[in-house]
């Protein structure tokens, strides 16, 4: 999103370090009188909510077996359209060719089996949905070889990436529930964490708490850059290769496209915030 | 893969288009306000906590300390507050505690098992009705509630139909056993079975019959002569103190002799390795007895006071000369003579035998011949001899239950020295031949890979196929899980409780406790049992619901309170290292304790056994004193077992009261000219550690050891691909040509050859059970892992 206004300038000459806080303070206090800013904020909130929804959609695709609703959304064309809208025409076409004449229950079971084969039951096509299996070192550094002369893959669950992910959850005031416990760097949890942060951003924007919204955006970007983005590519490629069902190929494509686009967008936004607050003096750039 | 680039507009469109398609309930909860985010993460950050618990990478339960940093297990080290891992007699423990304890490679590699990416994480339901080796079950994840509801519904239907007894229950034997036994009793099946009959129940039978205790332990540290038949304790560690206690014994001056067809790691550290033909150890022991008695080197007074049947025994061994034994065993008569003299004249001495001679059809009698050597030389329960441990442990919490009167499927009661763990091979055979009292319908398999552990792999697969419904609870998709209708994700030892009270010679109670919560939120096995019991509404004999409000912590707290520690779970947790021990330490010669016989007690003039008026043994009269004696039927060590002599084995053959030598049933012939044996090493347990890369790095293939002379005759060279063939199976293997194995024997390490299980384990080495016949020894029900003959030829 482009900043709503670039016309007003701040003529004060305060130290850069103080500027950002001051600016947001000013915005927070004057915003309600300024329709333009309010509208912009509203639009940002809408985008944040949309992002939260998409993160939730993706999280659910990896965190639990498909539901009947998903099957219906495939059958009635909802997902087809959605895939088309974002330029995944070939996935849409595959999905289209897949569905007709199929009983919803059969289709559901087929997708449950596919989901389990890909993300749950270790086997030849298993794509471990855990960051540590991608980001962590392949081996413990030992040069010992197995007695067939091969180096063994020693990556394990709950590696450093999981610890780092959990730490960021805790910093954001969130803990993984005991009941539906999973290892903290499960793709579903990482995506859902972003859903929470986007939701927070939207809520903060809607209640005029600009600092909180900014904080959430900062956390989103930090989490994406340090946790999700570094492995999402390899994960989605692996899913794309292993998936037999077009739905999961489509979801993998969509995940990768969306996450990378979101990172890019957030980076752009962040640079604008930094520029605006710290450099050009563009008070309304938030 | 095409990666779309999405604009913000498309975000909005996508969100709108997919609204309501899927909504994942939150997997996060807000942290309580009182915990600041920093506070939540900080305290555990740097050094974390050290939590005492017990290893279970094998059944040995060595004491360990786990370092948990940020909710993750970062390091495991030995716990010197627990003697298991350090010593098995108290004086040695107290004296050397400060030197530190040990963990074997498996224990050191335990963290990987906890965090193995190939673990089963969610309950899985089979959707492909076809079952078989390598057939994709087409798993589908289901929720825990669905899984438990479905299993409970199957169990309920069976029970409502009056068929509760057709449920088979299999479990590992050193974890959460009591509560499973309770479940089976309350549910109404007699078919509760455990792993032990795949392990060492013949040894249990041997020592139970000779000295009244089924698991004596050697005080090797204090010994001067250590003689082992078919045991590899320096490598096949169970309790990581084993190697130390033996090498300390050697340092203290013990001479160490190993009789084994294979030059095991242990044999390689011995003063002498004596290669022997498999299953003939009993013959060598009888010849040793012959020499010892002929040369009057036995302990006359001890035998007179503390043994029965000596005269019959000495008459029996009169013609069991070293020359006689040489023909059977392949061990030179002079060697037998020399070992017999050394053993009888060096005091104190230990003689012991484990699974080497223990997994053949003549295991019990052969083993008894070895065990009586201890009685003959007075080397029993004294410092430096084989010891009768004082178990501490926990007591099974009291439960009132009316057990079913239906017979067991395996006919356990017909095995004269059968073990409460049942007879797996008979279960498999009855499912297949239909000759049991009924056909079983359902099985629950806890933490057991039956397919790779019961002799006769194909039979096991076919038997499992015949059951209507199979539940497997395991941390891996094992070859047995591949045959299941439902798989539940198991827990590792770092995620669950256990009370441990054995493996050393004095009463010690130690605790295994979860150091991290189950990492996938899964239920530990005992909670699965509780949940099923609850759903079924199982009631005790008084009609009180047993599982309804049962918490496993309370259950084991009662176990601890009922045992020798007499403290609660919380009190045990608070003790250093979570270990309680009896300050009195190891007691020797416990049979000498004097007892006061009750009014009306009578003495058997022949044996000295003192019995109360109901005929119950209350002591043994030696001289003019009445002692506690041994827990045998006569209260004395038994060269001759009256009780065995009165019974028939499972084949209906009478049993000799003496440890008579008979050859095992299956001997090499022209077609299958080689004995095939197997063994274990420190880096693997059963078939269950083979997905651990740290352990596979040590050994990831079981090449077939073959003597160089034999190999030369067959034109086989080291590293050659070969065929191994028995009447029951044929598979490829790789040859390891060595001088360290008897020329008539080939052998390898057990546990390899997975075709499922995990990506590290899969396809490594050759599975040994496929060559075997599905049989047990006819006295104890011990699975015959080593009674197999093969031919070997170049592939
Ligand atoms: S012997 Fe090794 S695997 Fe077994 S309990 Fe001890 S440390 Fe663990």
Give the ranges of each region predicted by the language model.
Chain B
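Flexible, glycine/charged-enriched surface loops at secondary-structure junctions
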Residues: 162-166, 298-303, 350, 381-388, ...
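Active-site phosphate/pyrophosphate-binding segments
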Residues: 288, 307-424
């Amino acid at each position: 999103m482009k900043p709503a206004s670039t016309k007003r300038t701040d003529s004060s000459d305060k130290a850069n370090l103080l500027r950002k806080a001051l600016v947001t303070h000013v915005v927070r206090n004057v915003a309600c009188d300024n329709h333009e800013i309010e509208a912009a904020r509203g639009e940002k909130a809408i985008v944040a909510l949309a992002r939260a929804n998409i993160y939730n959609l993706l999280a659910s695709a990896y965190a639990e077996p498909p539901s009947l609703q998903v099957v219906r959304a495939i059958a009635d064309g909802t997902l087809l359209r959605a895939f088309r809208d974002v330029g995944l025409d070939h996935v849409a076409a595959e999905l289209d060719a897949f569905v007709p004449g199929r009983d919803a229950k059969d289709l559901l079971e087929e997708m449950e089996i596919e989901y389990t084969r890909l993300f749950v039951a270790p086997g030849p096509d298993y794509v471990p949905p855990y960051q540590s299996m991608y980001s962590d070192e392949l081996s413990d550094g030992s040069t010992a070889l197995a007695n067939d002369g091969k180096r063994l893959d020693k990556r394990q669950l709950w590696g450093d990436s999981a610890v780092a992910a959990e730490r960021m959850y805790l910093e954001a005031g969130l803990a993984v529930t005991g009941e539906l416990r999973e290892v903290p760097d499960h793709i579903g949890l990482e995506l859902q964490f972003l859903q929470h942060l986007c939701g927070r951003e939207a809520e903060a924007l809607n209640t005029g708490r600009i600092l909180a919204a900014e904080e959430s955006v900062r956390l989103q970007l930090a989490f994406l850059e340090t946790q999700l983005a570094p492995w999402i590519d390899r994960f989605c490629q692996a899913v794309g290769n292993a998936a037999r069902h077009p739905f999961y190929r489509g979801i993998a494509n969509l995940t990768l496209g969306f996450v990378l686009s979101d990172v890019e967008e957030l980076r752009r936004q962040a640079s604008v915030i930094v520029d605006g607050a710290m450099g050009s003096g563009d008070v309304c750039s938030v | 893969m095409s990666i779309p680039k999405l604009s913000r507009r498309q975000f909005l469109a996508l969100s709108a288009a997919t609204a309501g398609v899927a909504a994942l309930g939150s997997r996060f909860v807000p942290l309580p306000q009182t915990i600041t985010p920093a506070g939540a993460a900080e305290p555990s950050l740097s050094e974390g906590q050290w939590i005492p618990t017990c290893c279970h990478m094998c059944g040995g339960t060595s004491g360990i300390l786990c370092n948990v940093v940020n909710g993750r297990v970062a390091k495991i080290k030995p716990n010197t507050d627990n003697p298991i891992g350090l010593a098995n007699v108290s004086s040695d423990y107290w004296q050397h505690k400060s030197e530190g304890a040990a963990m074997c490679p498996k224990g050191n590699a335990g963290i990987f098992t906890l965090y193995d990416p190939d673990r089963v994480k969610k309950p899985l339901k089979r959707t492909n009705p076809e079952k078989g080796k390598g057939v994709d079950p087409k798993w589908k994840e289901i929720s825990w509630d669905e899984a438990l509801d479905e299993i409970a519904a199957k169990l309920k239907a069976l029970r409502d139909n009056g068929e509760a007894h057709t449920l088979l229950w299999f479990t590992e034997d050193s974890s959460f056993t009591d509560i499973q036994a309770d479940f089976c009793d309350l549910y109404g099946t007699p078919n509760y079975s455990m792993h032990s009959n795949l392990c060492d129940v013949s040894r249990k039978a041997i020592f139970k019959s000779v000295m009244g205790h089924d698991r004596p332990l050697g005080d090797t540290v204090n010994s001067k002569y250590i003689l082992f038949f078919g045991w590899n304790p320096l490598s096949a560690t169970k309790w990581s103190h084993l190697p130390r206690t033996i090498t300390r014994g050697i340092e203290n001056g013990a001479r160490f002799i190993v009789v084994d067809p294979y030059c095991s790691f242990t044999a390689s550290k011995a003063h002498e390795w004596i290669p022997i033909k498999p299953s003939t150890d009993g013959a060598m022991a009888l010849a040793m007895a012959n020499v010892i008695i002929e040369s009057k080197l036995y302990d006359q007074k001890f035998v007179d006071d503390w043994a029965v049947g000596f005269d019959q025994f000495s008459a029996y061994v009169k013609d069991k000369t070293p020359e006689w034994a040489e023909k059977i065993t392949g061990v030179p008569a002079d060697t037998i003579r020399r070992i017999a003299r050394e053993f009888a004249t060096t005091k104190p001495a230990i003689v012991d035998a484990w699974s080497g001679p223990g997994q053949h059809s003549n295991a019990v009698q052969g083993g008894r011949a070895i065990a009586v050597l201890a009685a003959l030389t007075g080397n029993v329960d004294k410092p430096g001899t084989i010891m009768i441990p004082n178990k501490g442990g926990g007591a099974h919490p009291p439960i009132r239950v009316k057990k079913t009167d239906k017979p067991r499927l395996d006919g356990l009661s017909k095995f004269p020295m059968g073990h409460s763990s049942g007879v797996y091979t008979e279960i498999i055979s009855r499912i297949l031949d239909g000759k049991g009292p009924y056909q079983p319908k359902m099985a629950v398999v806890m933490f057991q890979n039956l397919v790779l552990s019961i002799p006769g792999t194909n039979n096991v697969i076919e038997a499992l196929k015949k059951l209507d419904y199979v539940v497997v609870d395991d941390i891996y998709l094992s070859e047995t899980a591949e045959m299941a209708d439902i798989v539940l994700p198991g827990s590792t030892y770092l995620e669950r409780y256990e009370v441990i009270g054995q493996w050393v010679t004095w009463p010690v109670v130690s605790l295994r406790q979860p150091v991290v919560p189950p990492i996938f939120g899964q239920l530990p096995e005992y909670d699965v049992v509780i949940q099923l019991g609850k759903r079924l509404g199982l009631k005790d004999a008084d009609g009180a619901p047993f599982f309804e409000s049962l918490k496993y912590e309370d259950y084991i707290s009662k176990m601890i309170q009922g045992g020798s520690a007499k403290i609660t779970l919380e009190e045990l947790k608070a003790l250093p290292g979570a270990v309680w021990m009896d300050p009195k330490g190891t007691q020797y010669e416990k049979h000498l304790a004097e007892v006061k016989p009750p009014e009306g007690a009578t003495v058997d003039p022949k044996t000295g056994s003192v019995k109360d008026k109901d005929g119950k043994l209350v002591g043994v009269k030696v001289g003019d004193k009445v002692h506690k004696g041994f827990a045998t039927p006569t209260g004395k060590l038994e060269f001759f077992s009256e009780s065995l002599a009165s019974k028939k084995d499972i084949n209906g053959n009478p049993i000799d009261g003496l440890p008579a030598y008979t050859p095992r049933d299956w001997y090499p012939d022209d077609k299958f000219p080689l004995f095939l044996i197997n063994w274990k090493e420190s880096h693997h347990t059963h078939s269950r550690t083979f997905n651990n890369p740290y352990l596979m790095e040590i050994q990831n293939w079981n090449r077939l050891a073959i003597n160089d002379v034999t190999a030369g005759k067959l034109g086989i060279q080291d590293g050659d691909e070969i065929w191994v063939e028995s009447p029951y199976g044929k598979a490829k293997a790789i040859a390891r040509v060595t001088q360290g194995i008897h020329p008539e024997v080939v052998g390898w390490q057990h546990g390899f050859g997975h075709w499922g299980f995990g990506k590290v384990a899969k396809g490594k080495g050759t599975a040994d059970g496929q060559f075997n016949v599905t049989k047990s020894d006819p006295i104890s029900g011990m699975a015959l892992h080593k009674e197999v003959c093969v031919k070997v030829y170049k592939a």
